[in-house]
């Protein structure tokens, strides 16, 4: 199995776009990319905008190679409703648009489905379902919280197994910070796990200390399973001090022989936390 992180926050954009290829099927999970409209009270820097445009082109190129696309929820860093032609001829597995969903995402889902009417695409609502493609099994969790509660809605986690190796994709759990989010991860016990991580850059503001501590403990529990590589990114890598704050997790990984890294490191590319460095980028313009 080949797992390719295309666009992630450690690569300079808000995204978790990931390409997964087995001998049986090629899948693109969450083909979307965006930027924080404001960070440090500043709009996106031109370097961020250029990177977003570059990453969107890369996502579209990889979408051409995919037979299946999965949308785990309807935030714009995980799907783009305005270029639906990329899904033409594909099988599209969608988080259910009207069940276990908040008002904001429900509206976005309805708009997305309306746009998809112009495209030849096979759509299925995938919450809690399992799909077989040859010897490859793709399984989706039941909807779990986007974060600590239902305010931001629900997401589905993704598990892919081809008889030789296994991969799990958390979507936006912001942790995992509760048992429901963790249960699917522990049940599947995948070898390679991609998790968006706790929202430490909002710690004490929109992300509580309790949720952070739960996330750390849950990640340590996951490390104690069969995982070989744990990728932490997205919400976590909006924080320049993310490694420092996750020291306990890195230590647990080291003791268990589990590699803990960002998506950029996994992909073998330079880590560039452009959003977290936005104020610095603007300052450089003045010098």
UniProtKB/Swiss-Prot annotation:
Could you identify this protein by its name? UPF0282 protein AF_0504
The residues forming the signal peptide are none
User: Hey, which family's this protein in?
Assistant: Belongs to the UPF0282 family.
The record, for InterPro entries, names: RibonucZ/Hydroxyglut_hydro (IPR036866), UPF0173_UPF0282_UlaG_hydrolase (IPR050114), UPF0282_hydrls (IPR014426)
NCBIfam families per record: PRK04286.1-1
């Amino acid at each position: 199995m080949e797992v390719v992180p295309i666009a992630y926050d450690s690569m300079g954009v808000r995204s978790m776009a990931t390409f997964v290829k087995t001998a049986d099927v090629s899948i693109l999970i969450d083909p979307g990319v965006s930027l924080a409209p404001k960070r440090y009270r500043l709009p996106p820097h031109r370097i961020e905008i250029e990177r977003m445009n570059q990453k969107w082109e890369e996502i579209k190129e990889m979408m051409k190679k995919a037979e299946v696309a999965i949308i785990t929820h309807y935030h714009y860093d995980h799907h783009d409703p305005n270029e639906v032609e990329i899904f033409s001829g594909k099988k599209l597995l969608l988080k259910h648009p009207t069940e276990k969903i908040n008002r904001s995402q429900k509206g976005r889902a309805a708009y997305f489905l309306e746009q998809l009417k112009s495209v030849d695409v096979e759509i299925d609502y995938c919450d809690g379902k399992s799909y077989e493609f040859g010897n490859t099994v793709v399984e989706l969790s039941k909807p779990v919280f986007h974060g600590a509660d239902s305010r931001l809605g629900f997401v589905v986690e993704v598990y892919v197994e081809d008889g030789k190796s296994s991969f799990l994709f958390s979507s936006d759990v912001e942790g995992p910070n509760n048992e429901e989010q963790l249960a699917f991860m522990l049940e599947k016990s995948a070898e390679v796990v991609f998790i968006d991580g706790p929202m430490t850059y909002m710690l004490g503001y929109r992300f509580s200390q309790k949720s952070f501590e739960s996330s750390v403990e849950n990640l340590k529990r996951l490390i104690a399973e069969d995982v070989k590589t744990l990728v932490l990114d997205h919400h976590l890598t909006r924080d320049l001090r993310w490694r420092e704050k996750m020291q306990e997790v890195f230590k647990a990984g080291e003791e268990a022989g589990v590699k803990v890294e960002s998506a950029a490191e996994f992909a073998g590319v330079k880590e560039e936390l452009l959003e977290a460095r936005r104020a610095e980028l603007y300052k450089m313009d003045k010098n």
